[in-house]
Amino acid sequence: MENLYAGLEMLARWDVVLALFVGSIGGVIIGAIPGVGPAVAIAILLPATFSLDPIVGLTMLLGIYGSSMYGGAIPAILINTPGTAVNALTSYDGYPMTQNGEGHRALSLAYSASFWGGIFGIGCLILLSPVLALIAPMFGSREIFLAALLGIILVVLAHRGQIFAAGVLAMFGIFLQTVGLDAVTYTQRYTFGYSFLSSGINLIVVVLGLFALSQAFFLLTAPDNVPDAKPVQGKMTAGIKELMKHKRVATVASAFGVVLGMIPGTGEFTAQFMSYTYAQKTSKNPELFGKGSPEGLIASEAANNAVPAAAMIPLLALGIPGEALTAMMLSVFYVHNVIPGPQLFQNHIDLVYGLYFALILLNVIVMIFLLFSTNLLTKIIRVPTRFLGVMILILSFVGVYSLRNSLTDCMISASFGVLGLVLKRLNLPIVPIILGMVLGGIMEVKLRSAMPRL
């Protein structure tokens, strides 16, 4: 009970509540605008959170992460253009429902299923992360090295059809984290005589380049487009009752989201695809899938919204991120000398419970906001892509420069932006580079500390 009160007390602070509202509502808006996405938004905001209290910065980023998929369902359903990549399957059944004049029903079902999946995922986070944190001290350097290596392998295997490319990009990420000071001997390595590489390549500089700047370049080089989304008419609460008729589908899909969200490299799309396939195979009306099936819509939305909370389980309990967004959040912990893992549950239990309550509250805030503001969001969808590109470009460079007031960082980030654009054009994954940088650092330190005992 003492931990419970500590978490509630932390969440009751005005700055935390403000950060949660800004992150939650901002995440919905960002998710609703095709071409932006949570990775871009979090990458841009990340430098600003370093000067904030850990709970404030993490709450804001969690708000964006957890709410963006709610918003991403809106354009997927109304204009057949997913707001985020993980809402791709939502358009399969959501858009046909809109064509049949049931757009309000589809949106209401999507919101309700997302809320169900979000709360289910948070419940599993609260139950499983302390248990995993208790087991974690039994892991030595060798076990943690193997866990990080497994994470790299799973990230690579998750990109079916691109396993070789994903493996090469993951190794490139591992190489990037070796540049600069040796983590054990503190000697220079791979600087090639350039002084600006002596302190290493900053993860945030790479993240902003690969995600934010590459997306800005992509939007600026693409034909200008203004999506057309018409206002929605009808009761937005109808889907809440209908969801209860399909609660088995919602629960199973949420379970898929939790299990796959805990596994590094799998993420929302894999969970969404597997839950959608399961729902179709077990449905009494499988022929409706892809033509406006409420079960298909519920399965996809419940699964992808259960993932954010589930992805926090290995991050909080082991300090191992499972995807790019949790890797970004890991940097917020490190900046404030708060190390995720078993010690987090011993020394900063109030922060842990504060994050639990923040996740619950963000789902409530987003659900209420969407029920009353959907038509407002349909207007926001109509933002021209060129305007988005310019805004992302400006904010990204401001974020990079604010890290160390360095123009060199801006040039490095721009280089990674070009690399990210090339990878997008070639339809190659970006995530393995980021996870290679994060998990590669863990692997190196743990391997070298374990070697004397081999």
Please describe what each predicted stretch is.
Residues 108-225, 335-454:
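Membrane-embedded alpha-helical modules
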Residues 24-38, 68-80, 155-160, 254-266, ...:
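Transmembrane alpha-helix interface/packing and boundary motifs in multi-pass membrane proteins
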Residues 66-71, 112-124, 132, 176, ...:
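Membrane-embedded alpha-helical segments of transport systems
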Residues 38-48, 61, 76-96, 127, ...:
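Re-entrant/interfacial helical elements at transmembrane boundaries that shape
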Residues 55-59, 96-113, 283-296, 320, ...:
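Membrane-interface alpha-helices at helix entry/exit sites of multi-pass transporters
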Residues 1-55, 137, 188-293, 378, ...:
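Helix-loop-helix hairpins and the membrane-proximal interhelical loops
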Residues 65-76, 83, 293-318, 322, ...:
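A structural-propensity feature for long, helix-poor, extended segments
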Residues 29-39, 77-87, 120-124, 260-269, ...:
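Short helix-coil transition sites and intra-membrane helix breaks within transmembrane domains
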